Structures are given as structure tokens and as C-alpha cells.
Curated annotation (Swiss-Prot):
CDD domains: LDH_1. One of its GO terms (molecular function) is L-lactate dehydrogenase activity. The gene is ldhb. GO terms for biological process: lactate metabolic process; pyruvate metabolic process. NCBIfam families: L-LDH-NAD, PRK00066.1. InterPro entries: L-lactate/malate_DH, L-lactate_DH, L-lactate_DH_AS, Lactate/malate_DH_C, Lactate/malate_DH_N, Lactate_DH/Glyco_Ohase_4_C, NAD(P)-bd_dom_sf. Interconverts simultaneously and stereospecifically pyruvate and lactate with concomitant interconversion of NADH and NAD(+). Keywords: Cytoplasm, NAD, Oxidoreductase. This is L-lactate dehydrogenase B chain. SUPFAM superfamilies: LDH C-terminal domain-like, NAD(P)-binding Rossmann-fold domains. Gene3D superfamilies: Lactate dehydrogenase/glycoside hydrolase, family 4, C-terminal, NAD(P)-binding Rossmann-like Domain.
Amino acid sequence: MSTVQEKLITNVCQDKAAKPTNKITIVGVGQVGMACAVSVLLKELADELALVDILEDKLKGEVMDLQHGSLFLKTPTIVADKDYSVTANSRIVVVTGGVPQQEGESRLNLVQRNVNVFKFIIPQVVKYSPDCIIIVVSNPVDILTYVTWKLSGLPQHRIIGSGTNLDSARFRHLISEKLGVHPSSCHGFILGEHGDTSVAVWSGVNVAGVSLQSLKPEIGTDQDSCNWKEVHKKVVDSAYEVIKLKGYTNWAIGFSVAEIVESITKNLGRVHPVSTMVKGMYGIETEVFLSLPCVLNGNGLTSVINQKLKDDEVGQLQKSAETLWGIQKDLKDL
């Protein structure tokens, strides 16, 4: 007896489902992972979205919730599983998984615990998607991007840390608030570590090509009567402030990651401040990953823009590298 489906549909092609060409996987379905997932869905960047996590009930609930909204989305397939086979043939894998920092825990201890988590995650990702591009979001992101590069065996251009893409967005937002100009018209970069030693490149801050330093040479320094230096301090402190108020950060990093994904999936060649290997640049001679302005397209991170930095900015970048190397050099089991 024929089923309703058989009576309704006459098949013309035996292979009804085409293989996805822009499959995106999110590893970790916590607040950040789900913000990344929703941002990717709303920007219509994937023809298949896969979620993976060790928390089975949480994972099942999140994927059901997204699937129930399928009518309002243009991503035909949303899947989830604890088993990494669900991630097979991903074009991009976004890693948000890891362990949270405990009260009083040293940064090195936190990193080492996350190394142990990544030793499980990364080989599984590469096993099922050997040609993928990996975007690392878990913190401390620069060190864990280095860890991912070491564990994956993938070339540098396919390992990207979300880095200071969000820090730079915060920077531009705060500049826009001071000037009354939209953030998209306020240009400036935060480089280096995604964290306390990040570098505000005041020499490059401009609106419509007009350098703010040309108008006020002391901008961003202690001698600045307008206290623009406070803008960078707010960038550094902003995550702590949001966490204090709501317990975590998720939406802005989700939007930031989706923009990085978009530059890759749409082969845009846009410049993003993201974390990459910087050995040999700006006098840095250690294997650290830091954020520099990078070109992202369909092949991944294809080039770095050689930004003209002032001597004090180069010094700050080198200090950022030293801070990360101080932790990185003591990591075990890589």
C-alpha cells in the first residue's frame, strides 16, 4: 500500500538530497556556542548546521528548539549529536567548548585543563573534516589557537582564532559614542592578545580618512586632556563588566564569529583582526598566536596586512607576545 508521501511526490532523481557545500559545525552548546549558531542561522551562512557537545540532554533540547524554528530560517538541515561523525564534511568548525575558570585558579592551570579538553575535540574534528577551517573561540583564545594548530596538524591558514575581532568592534563602538558617528565609519584596530595586554593602535584610528592623531597628537596617551585612553581601558574591562551584570558574554561574540564565518563562506577577502601565528613579525621570535589585520577568504586566512605601527605600539605588541609565551612554554602534552 502506498504511503502519503509516495502518493504526493513523484521522484525524478534518486539522490534527492544534495550534499551540503557550506556545512558549519559548532562545538559546544553553551551560551557562546548557541549565540554563534543563531548568528550563523540568521545570516544564512550554512546549508547544514551541526552541533556537538558532551551534554546530551542540553544538546537535544537546543537542536529541537532550533528545528522548531525551521519555518523562519533558510538552513535546510540542523543536526546534533555527541558523536563527532555528525560533523563530517564540515567546511568550517567553530570551537567554543572548554572548561570555565574556577575561583582563584591560575591562568596556566586553566589553559592546561583546556588543553586536555582540546586533545579530545581537535583530533575528532580533523578525523571527520580533514579539509575544514577551524575557528577557535574558547578562552584564552590565542593560546588555544596555538594548541589547536599543534594538535590538528593543519596548515596555519586554516587555523584562526576569533582574537580581537570583538575587541576592535567594542573599540569602534566606544569611539562612535564619543564622536556621534556610526561605528562602521569609525576605523581602528585592537591588536595583540584578546585580553589584558591588547594593543590599541591609536596611530591608525580615523574617520573618513582623517587621523584622530593628526588632530590631537597626544590622543590615547596619559597627556591627553580628553582622556581617550579610557576608551581602550573600557574595551579591556567590558567583558568583565558584562559578566558581572549578566553572568556571561555571548551575543557580541556570536555576531563577531558569524562575520568571520561570512568572510570565509562568501570568499569576501575582508580584513579582520584575528589570531594567527606571528613569529617573524614585528620582532617577535616565539611561536605565539596574536591578532593582526588578516585577509579572510574562501581559503581561510590568506595574508596579513603589514600595518605601520609606531615604536611604542610595536613594544606593546612584543609585550603581549611575551605574556602569552610565558604561559605557552610551560604547557604539557602537546
